[in-house]
Amino acid sequence: MLPINNNFSLPQNSFYNTISGTYADYFSAWDKWEKQALPGEERDEAVSRLKECLINNSDELRLDRLNLSSLPDNLPAQITLLNVSYNQLTNLPELPVTLKKLYSASNKLSELPVLPPALESLQVQHNELENLPALPDSLLTMNISYNEIVSLPSLPQALKNLRATRNFLTELPAFSEGNNPVVREYFFDRNQISHIPESILNLRNECSIHISDNPLSSHALQALQRLTSSPDYHGPRIYFSMSDGQQNTLHRPLADAVTAWFPENKQSDVSQIWHAFEHEEHANTFSAFLDRLSDTVSARNTSGFREQVAAWLEKLSASAELRQQSFAVAADATESCEDRVALTWNNLRKTLLVHQASEGLFDNDTGALLSLGREMFRLEILEDIARDKVRTLHFVDEIEVYLAFQTMLAEKLQLSTAVKEMRFYGVSGVTANDLRTAEAMVRSREENEFKDWFSLWGPWHAVLKRTEADRWAQAEEQKYEMLENEYPQRVADRLKASGLSGDADAEREAGAQVMRETEQLIYRQLTDEVLALRLSENGSQLHHS
């Protein structure tokens, strides 16, 4: 940090006197501005940086995080970067024409001045902007998220990245592409956009448009799905969600949301217990999640669903660790559609089972632990498949894709944690052929990879530490002996073979690979030994249908 010098002055000789005369107007105005500081403002530090920037002819001026309520009118004319983020600014002065990068995030700006003609980056997220001035043709990146903007001016042809999340936009700007080679990624999530202009199809297929959590009409969704599903479609990838963009952000007290899942004769006791958790992190969003969960198709149509949720909530009340994990998993669940709530419920049930396994529920039931591990493995593979499917779609709600594979294959793959119904399968883009291929891939990878995966699974290790302490200690000793005696040479050999000796990044990667291979070998041997003993005793089988 530059030293604070309220009385910044120059040496008294003829050369510096000439310079001082040139800067006199700047210095005088800045000193006057400093004297008008409000309590808490660090204008003395700001003036020190201003003078240092001017004298050194620096092209960067950083006045961020100084609690400034205003800036002086005359900024150094030569700067190309200005950072005034995290202050209390309500407006900006006239900007130097040389400016290329403007950072003014997290202020209280209600408007912007005329933007310099050479500006390339505009970062003004988290302000109170209601509109924007004309955007210069040179602009490459812009972040205007978390403002109050209703409409956008024309977008420059050069603009590559635009983030306009959480505004009040009611429509998208017109898109004109032609032969422009620019690859664009634009974010318009969480606005009030109800329709999509046909000009969006002018964008190249390498471009991405994000419009999740907007009140898109069913007509707009159907039209876009029809267009983007065409074999000759060459437009951008469009990310949307089956949300009306108007989820209720209000929530009732946590205890009230929880007790609603219990029979009346238990509600008083349950309420008293859960009142103690109302100030825990994510408690408010967890309350909202519970209310949204009650309105899913599974809650309405699945017998015993309410009792299942109540039993789960009882387990949460008894374990601070499990409750913390579950609150975090549910944190963003209500920001999208009903199916996101359903997918979150799947994840919460996984969290519960893995927690129970780690805590010892299956210590004496290896067959049940294997079944749980097999289900977790299958879900991991389905996530990989869903991720690959998302990349092939031009009009995609990622939540629907992930949930579709779990829901539609829940019975065939014996997924106890997956809901059996979803609301918007029709827009997922997942076909019957996708499901057949996914099932075959899961079974093939399970046959070839599950034993290795299970041998490295955390809950299995927790069981081994508790129930096979001597064998676990021997395996750990063997691992550290191999790492001490063989690890350095194996890493060196791998780097030499790839011609990357001396490359620090390559060394870290090679080291991680050798470590994983070592653990895989030792833990697989231990797993085979323990499972052979336990499964022969109780008649369970490692292989499963």
UniProtKB/Swiss-Prot annotation:
InterPro entries to which the protein is assigned, alphabetical: LRR-bact_E3_ubiq_ligases, LRR_dom_sf, LRR_E3_ligase_N, NEL_dom
Keywords, ordered alphabetically: Host cytoplasm, Host nucleus, Leucine-rich repeat, Plasmid, Repeat, Secreted, Transferase, Ubl conjugation, Ubl conjugation pathway, Virulence
Entry GO terms, CC: extracellular region; host cell cytosol; host cell nucleus
Catalysed reaction equations from the record: S-ubiquitinyl-[E2 ubiquitin-conjugating enzyme]-L-cysteine + [acceptor protein]-L-lysine = [E2 ubiquitin-conjugating enzyme]-L-cysteine + N(6)-ubiquitinyl-[acceptor protein]-L-lysine
First and last residues of every LRR repeat: 57-77, 78-99, 100-117, 118-139, 140-157, 158-179, 182-203, 205-228
GO molecular function: ubiquitin protein ligase activity; ubiquitin-protein transferase activity
Activity regulation field: Exists in an autoinhibited state in the absence of substrate protein, due to interactions of the leucine-rich repeats with NEL domain. Is activated upon binding to a substrate protein.
Interaction with target proteins: annotated segments: 1-242
Region (Linker): 243-250
Cellular localisation: Secreted; Host cytoplasm; Host nucleus
Annotated spans, E3 ubiquitin-protein ligase catalytic domain: 251-545
Class of the enzyme per the UniProt entry, highest EC level: transferase
GO biological process: protein K27-linked ubiquitination; protein K48-linked ubiquitination; symbiont-mediated suppression of host innate immune response
Residues of the NEL domain: 253-545
Post-translational modification: Ubiquitinated in the presence of host E1 ubiquitin-activating enzyme, E2 ubiquitin-conjugating enzyme and ubiquitin.
Active site (UniProt): 337 (glycyl thioester intermediate)
EC code(s) of this entry: 2.3.2.27
Subunit structure comment from the entry: Also interacts with human and mouse U2AF1 (U2AF35).
Membership in a protein family: Belongs to the LRR-containing bacterial E3 ligase family.
Stated role: Effector E3 ubiquitin ligase that interferes with host's ubiquitination pathway and modulates the acute inflammatory responses, thus facilitating bacterial colonization within the host cell. Interacts with IKBKG (NEMO) and TNIP1 (ABIN-1), a ubiquitin-binding adapter protein, which results in TNIP1-dependent 'Lys-27'-linked polyubiquitination of IKBKG. Consequently, polyubiquitinated IKBKG undergoes proteasome-dependent degradation, which perturbs NF-kappa-B activation during bacterial infection. Mediates polyubiquitination of host U2AF1, leading to its proteasomal degradation.
Comment field on protein domains: The LRR (leucine-rich repeat) repeats are involved in substrate recognition with target proteins.
PANTHER family: OLIGODENDROCYTE-MYELIN GLYCOPROTEIN, PTHR47114
Name of the protein this chain belongs to: E3 ubiquitin-protein ligase ipaH9.8
Gene: ipaH9.8
